[in-house]
């Protein structure tokens, strides 16, 4: 059976190799880094598991959980977040305010909790109540998340309830992000009920929440990519090197890695869209142009570990979110010792700062020491922390977060339609139809199945 070339050894590439191996289809992974796993990386320091990339995945998307049931050693690894302490705070006027319990994005699932909350004003609460009068609406074109929320509620709900949550996932601005691609569930509510509040109420009635919202792995998220590497990529040939170009040669695809030329019947590109665009620029310019049009945001992660007794502030909750208007360095902070207590040694507190969007761009040339100092200043102002951390870890992820801007779904549809003209060329990763790890695994599974069906 013809070998498949997989470009990129992150979770998408490793998952593709694994699913291909289930069909006995040989593959070769080309990875320029010294390690596989991509953005998934677990640092083990002084008895603590510190995630350099994603720390969990959403429980409502089953692809990763299903995968753990078949990978050796992972069946008993799944752990849930400590949802008994699932309190999230939002910074308003320089102070941490508890977000109302039961929120589903910007929509309240618990009216009493909303009434008691000081995150939004009485005027915003009235706007949320008025929204229940909306009638079903079928839009003819995509709109931004900002437009959707302001039309249904108001600017305050957008600033303090919506944007901070989205920023932690997409690292982008609401006025640019696509409502259809980022909030498809809510667009569905608008079409069916008109009111987003009515849609959430009905969903909570039909499918009450059960279990943890976030899932992870007991020994760290890197356990997933390590297991994939051993189970699937372990049967694949791994080539270390940087891909220069990809081009079609009759029914074959040629991949130049340094001075070497590799040939295969199928190529799966698992790199960021802008990297894929460079690889295809000379040979498939129409596809390359669509890929190059997908913008990206950068991220910086700073993990600080403190002596809990010296912290001087409670970490009873999952952490806090910082709206843009508060003008802080960090966009979000996770209190890891509460969200996943087993990851942090007893007596310690771990604060995970997330810097994204324009702030990450502004700090692109800043040193690690300068950024750490800015994060500490935010903690001092918001939490009153004056103690020095026992240690910290620091990671930059430049151009790592694809932005699903207005019109993204149409662009992806056009992109995939063009791919049908190039048999054997596939795109995997988080730039197309889902940014989470489960989305990457699902897409890898579907590509492997398609290659198998075409090879029969």
Model regions: which residues?
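Active-site/ligand-binding neighborhood in enzyme catalytic cores
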Residues: 126-245
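Conserved flavin/dinucleotide-binding core of flavoenzymes
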Residues: 100-102, 315-317, 332-456
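Dinucleotide-binding Rossmann-like beta1-alpha1 core, especially the glycine-rich loop
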Residues: 46-136
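N-terminal Rossmann-like FAD-binding beta1-loop-alpha1 element of flavoenzymes
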Residues: 2-29
């Amino acid at each position: 059976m013809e070998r498949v070339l997989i470009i990129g050894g992150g979770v998408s590439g490793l998952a593709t190799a694994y699913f291909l191996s289930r069909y006995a289809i040989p593959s070769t992974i080309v990875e320029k880094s010294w390690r596989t796993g991509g953005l998934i990386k677990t640092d083990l320091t002084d008895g603590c598991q510190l995630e350099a990339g994603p720390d969990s995945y959403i429980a409502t998307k089953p692809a990763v959980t299903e995968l753990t049931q078949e990978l050796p050693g992972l069946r008993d690894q799944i752990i849930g977040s400590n949802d008994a302490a699932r309190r999230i705070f939002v910074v308003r006027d320089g102070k941490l305010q508890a977000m109302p319990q039961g929120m589903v994005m910007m929509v309240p699932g618990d009216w009493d909790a909303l009434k008691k909350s000081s995150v939004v004003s009485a005027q915003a609460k009235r706007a949320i109540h008025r929204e229940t009068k909306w009638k079903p609406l079928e839009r003819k074109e995509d709109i931004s998340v900002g437009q959707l929320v302001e039309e249904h509620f108001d600017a305050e709900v957008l600033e303090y309830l919506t944007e901070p949550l989205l920023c932690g996932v997409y690292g982008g601005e609401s006025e640019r992000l696509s409502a259809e691609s980022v909030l498809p569930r809510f667009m569905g509510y608008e079409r069916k009920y008109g009111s987003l509040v009515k849609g959430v109420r009905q969903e909570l009635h039909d499918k009450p929440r059960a279990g943890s919202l976030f899932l992870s792995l007991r020994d760290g998220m890197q356990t997933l990519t390590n297991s994939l590497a051993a189970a699937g990529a372990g049967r694949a040939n791994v080539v270390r090197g940087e891909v220069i170009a990809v081009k079609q040669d009759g029914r074959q695809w040629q991949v130049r890695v340094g001075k070497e030329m590799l040939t295969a019947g199928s190529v799966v590109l698992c790199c960021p869209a802008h990297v894929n665009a460079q690889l295809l620029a000379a040979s498939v310019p129409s596809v390359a142009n669509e890929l190059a049009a997908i913008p990206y945001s950068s991220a910086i992660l700073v993990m600080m570990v403190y002596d809990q007794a010296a912290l001087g502030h409670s970490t009873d909750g999952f952490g806090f979110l910082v709206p843009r208007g508060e003008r802080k360095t960090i966009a979000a902070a996770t209190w890891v010792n509460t969200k996943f207590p087993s990851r942090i040694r007893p007596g310690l507190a771990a604060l995970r700062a997330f810097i994204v969007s324009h702030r990450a761009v502004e700090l692109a040339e800043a040193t690690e020491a300068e950024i750490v100092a800015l994060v500490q200043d935010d903690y001092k102002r918001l939490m009153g922390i004056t103690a020095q951390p026992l240690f910290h870890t620091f990671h930059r992820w430049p151009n790592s977060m694809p932005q699903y801007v207005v019109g993204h779904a149409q662009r992806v549809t056009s992109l995939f339609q063009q791919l049908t003209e190039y048999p054997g060329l596939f795109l995997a990763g988080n730039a197309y139809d889902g940014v989470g790890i489960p989305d990457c695994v699902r897409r890898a599974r579907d590509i492997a199945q398609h290659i198998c069906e075409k090879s029969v």
